[in-house]
Amino acid sequence: MTNIRKHHPLAKMINHSFIDLPTPSNISSWWNFGSLLGLCLVIQITTGLFLAMHYTPDTTTAFSSITHICRDVNYGWIIRYLHANGASMFFICLFMHIGRGLYYGSFTFLETWNIGVILLFAVMATAFMGYVLPWGQMSFWGATVITNLLSAIPYMGTNLVEWIWGGFSVDKATLTRFFAFHFILPFIITALAMVHLLFLHETGSNNPSGISSDPDKIPFHPYYTTKDLLGVILLLLALFSLVLFSPDLLGDPDNYTPVNPLNTPPHIKPEWYFLFAYAILRSIPNKLGGVLALALSILILILIPFLHTAKQRSMMFRPLSQCLYWMLAADLLTLTWIGGQPVENPFITIGQVASIIYFSTILILMPLTNLLENKLLKW
């Protein structure tokens, strides 16, 4: 058996990636989220495939096909809610994974980090297009508002929006192409995840201390397969609790109303995992400025390795940076809350202050704090 595992071309690849992989002996539970993201992706592709068997991407039947899935298809309701809430779990794991990378300095693996940022964009695009497919009120108006942002691009904006719509408004052509892209993107994400792992295994994993773990490695199996299994059980417990007890907790009630282009919902808002970026978009009165801030709120992750001025990689022994990090985490939670509130005072002011704190913390305060810590630690 060992012979096959170590010499068969396919088994050898799996062996080097998941069984005999040399892994730092001190990585904490924060390193579990990579495997949990893989699990989420498998859940999403599987449930999505079964949903696609019954869904019809047509403006006249899309909403009723979702109703049909929930009422008439065997266990259709659980497949639908696993898919919807699985997306929320995906983003929780994604934010934790990125947060761990920021805290422990994993962004110094440049290729792995940049592929990760591309993956984040791909997952966000997939989730956005998936939100349009049920063809409820929030699906339609969310699609209209978010795609309309591209009209802020000078000279070519309006043409670009109409090209994406496939007409002069969000309609049948838009729904059909969003379904096609929503179906294909998870497979592209899978390919990108493999590239992400390929680059990671070139350098080996980081660890909480941030120093080289070459002298102290252990095999991935059985130590970390067992540890990952605990994460898997906890994730599935949380997901099934959500699906079976409160499946609509994270959804929007407006999406249970079929599309009516003549009736705008009082508060148009995306799913909870986009609210922080949506709050940044809304905090700037100028349309183009808002769109640029929205894009930069995610693209700023690419700059982080170049803004890292500390001599120590991890924040584990840097208390000042830790304070800033948790301030940034609290700020993102504030932005998420503001994104779900109506556009009126005091929410407008809070959103603007939180947006300024977000950008200034990453671009100014963190690099300066790193330099100060270098001085204090006499590097």
Curated annotation (Swiss-Prot):
Keywords: Electron transport, Heme, Iron, Membrane, Metal-binding, Mitochondrion, Mitochondrion inner membrane, Respiratory chain, Transmembrane, Transmembrane helix, Transport, Ubiquinone. One of its GO terms (cellular component) is respiratory chain complex III. Its cofactor is heme b. Heme b b566 binds at residues 97, 196. Heme b b562 binds at residues 83, 182. GO terms for biological process: mitochondrial electron transport, ubiquinol to cytochrome c. Binds 2 heme b groups non-covalently. It is found in: Mitochondrion inner membrane. InterPro entries: Cyt_b/b6_C, Cyt_b/b6_C_sf, Cyt_b/b6_N, Cytb/b6-like_sf, Cytochrome_b, Cytochrome_b_C_euk/bac, Cytochrome_b_N_euk/bac, Di-haem_cyt_TM. The keyword Cytoplasm does not apply. It comes from the Eukaryota. One of its GO terms (molecular function) is ubiquinol-cytochrome-c reductase activity. It holds the Pfam family Cytochrome_B. CDD domains: cytochrome_b_C, Cytochrome_b_N. The chain crosses the membrane at residues 33-53, 77-98, 113-133, 178-198, 226-246, 288-308, 320-340, 347-367. The keyword Acetylation does not apply. Coiled coil: none annotated. It is a multi-pass membrane protein. Component of the ubiquinol-cytochrome c reductase complex (complex III or cytochrome b-c1 complex) that is part of the mitochondrial respiratory chain. The b-c1 complex mediates electron transfer from ubiquinol to cytochrome c. Contributes to the generation of a proton gradient across the mitochondrial membrane that is then used for ATP synthesis. PANTHER family: CYTOCHROME B. The cytochrome bc1 complex contains 11 subunits: 3 respiratory subunits (MT-CYB, CYC1 and UQCRFS1), 2 core proteins (UQCRC1 and UQCRC2) and 6 low-molecular weight proteins (UQCRH/QCR6, UQCRB/QCR7, UQCRQ/QCR8, UQCR10/QCR9, UQCR11/QCR10 and a cleavage product of UQCRFS1). This cytochrome bc1 complex then forms a dimer. Heme 1 (or BL or b562) is low-potential and absorbs at about 562 nm, and heme 2 (or BH or b566) is high-potential and absorbs at about 566 nm. This is Cytochrome b. It comes from Galago gabonensis. The gene is MT-CYB.
